[in-house]
Regions:
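Helix-loop-helix connectors at the membrane interface of multi-pass transporters/channels
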Residues: 90-91, 121-143, 233-237, 242-252, ...
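Transmembrane-helix boundary/entry motifs in multi-pass membrane transporters
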Residues: 30-31, 55-62, 75-115, 130-141, ...
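Membrane-interface loop-to-helix entry segments
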Residues: 128, 141-188, 352-367, 385-392
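TM-loop-TM module centered on a large, flexible mid-protein loop between adjacent transmembrane helices
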Residues: 89-98, 248-302, 318-323, 336-340, ...
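Membrane-helix boundary/coupling elements in multi-pass transport proteins
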Residues: 109-123, 234, 288-323, 352-355
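Helix-loop-helix junctions that connect adjacent transmembrane segments
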Residues: 20-22, 137-139, 143-145, 161, ...
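A generic transmembrane alpha-helix motif of multi-pass inner-membrane proteins
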Residues: 1-21, 46, 61, 181-184, ...
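Extracellular loop-to-transmembrane helix junctions
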Residues: 2-30, 50-105, 126, 247-252, ...
Length: 408
């Protein structure tokens, strides 16, 4: 009873701090929220059962490896913010090799965003309906369409500021619940130290090739940091670089901590690797955690969808260039309209695999572009480690495009 009360109090206190006006109005925090919302998105709750089934007690090591690789990929995006963007701002840059690579990568990203925003909100609709014991594709598609149009229309009339506020509230609620979750699970582990036996062993039926492909898919789960690249109309390069780095470090710490505290409970998992698996498992910690995690899951879908919508606005502005000069709000409306079409004409749960590969292709091309920019720098400014590192990342990501198993 005491733990239940304490967990609710921690969640409420954390939410109060994050939603305080001083925090909400902080420009650095607002710029951090967009990548943070996208990184801790739909795959957050499914990572634990996925890694638990595939690598057993080595799940924290696997998660740390994925987060570290994602951070290095983020360094390529940050490099591009500082050094590629000035190159792309030059006249006729779109006809250069760097310009073409960047354009192709952004087309891939646009496709991924259109699908992922629709996927997040369709998942949100299903999650809400499941709570009311309603299983209807028509109702879920209708709710998804209403939310999509609501976000698009609000973005068109109210602009980026409104969408950022929506992000802030949903991310703050999600982070508050995560803080409560981590504390509760840690207390559960500490109170059961005598009976905890964590074996750093791998499953007996381990398939290494499957694990490698799955890790490539998990890498896409922690994507979203690239959204900072497309906030250029609102924030300067230095701000976007700093806040992207903070978002990656904070989200990485959360992912790793989440895996560590849940590892002792992995033996209780069945064969279910869906989001509901970890929600059901949280009952061993506290009766208040399952409903809190349902709210956190819903906020994850909403905040990730809004974050990708915001990034799509900046992406549309960049891709349209000086010839068409489409404003960011056109991107908000476009992604909502395309989403409505997708939700009624496709099985969004089937084509999400295409989005995962498109994200991997985007990162591969961005790393390739970073390699080209680093190579073209003056000899006295050229860093051979940048050239070699970005080239290696690009090669690894091109392989991931082909072999990755989507983890969402």
């Amino acid at each position: 009873m005491l733990l239940n009360t304490l967990l609710i109090a921690i969640a409420l206190l954390s939410a109060a701090i994050l939603l305080a006006k001083r925090v909400r109005d902080n420009a650095m925090w607002r710029a951090t929220v967009t990548p943070l919302a996208s990184i801790i998105g739909s795959g957050f709750l499914v990572v634990v059962p996925l890694l638990g089934h595939s690598v057993g007690g080595y799940a924290p090591v696997a998660m740390a490896a994925v987060v570290t690789l994602a951070y290095f990929i983020g360094s390529a995006i940050r490099f591009n913010i500082l050094y590629m963007e000035p190159v792309l701002a030059a006249p006729h840059s779109s006809t250069t090799a760097i310009g073409r690579v960047n354009t192709i990568s952004e087309i891939a990203l646009g496709i991924a965003y259109f699908i992922s925003v629709t996927f997040y909100l369709r998942l949100l609709s299903s999650f809400v309906l499941r709570g009311f014991q309603i299983d209807s594709d028509i109702v879920a598609q209708s709710i998804t369409s209403v939310i999509l149009l609501g976000i698009g229309i609000a973005g068109w009339f109210r602009g980026l500021a409104f969408l950022e506020r929506l992000e802030e509230y949903s991310v703050s609620i999600k982070l508050a619940i995560i803080a409560s979750l981590l504390f509760g699970w840690l207390m559960h582990d500490l109170s059961n130290l005598q009976s905890i036996h964590i074996a750093a062993t791998l499953p007996s039926d381990l398939d290494w090739w499957y694990v490698v492909r799955l890790m490539a898919g998990v890498l896409i789960v922690v994507q979203g940091f690239e959204t900072s690249r497309y906030l250029g109309d609102q924030y300067d390069g230095a701000t976007r670089v700093t806040t992207m780095r903070r978002a990656q470090l904070l989200s990485g710490a959360i992912y790793i901590a989440f895996i560590i505290v849940t590892v002792p409970s992995l033996v209780l998992l069945g064969d279910d690797v869906s989001e509901t698996a970890i929600i059901d498992l949280s009952r061993v910690v506290s009766v208040v955690l399952p409903p809190m995690l349902v709210i956190a899951a819903a906020m994850s879908q909403l905040s990730a969808a809004v974050a990708d919508t915001v990034a799509t606005g900046g992406l549309v502005t960049q891709v349209s260039g000086s010839r068409f000069q489409l404003p960011a709000k056109a991107g908000y409306l476009l992604v909502s309209l395309v989403g409505v079409i997708l939700v009624w004409t496709t099985d969004i749960f089937e084509i999400i695999a295409l989005a995962s590969r498109a994200f991997a292709l985007y990162y591969a091309l961005q790393c390739l572009g970073a390699t080209m920019v680093a190579w073209q720098q003056q000899k006295d400014a050229r860093n051979p480690w940048h050239v070699a590192g970005f080239a290696l990342l690009s090669a690894l990501l091109f392989v991931a495009v082909v072999i990755a198993i989507p983890a969402d």
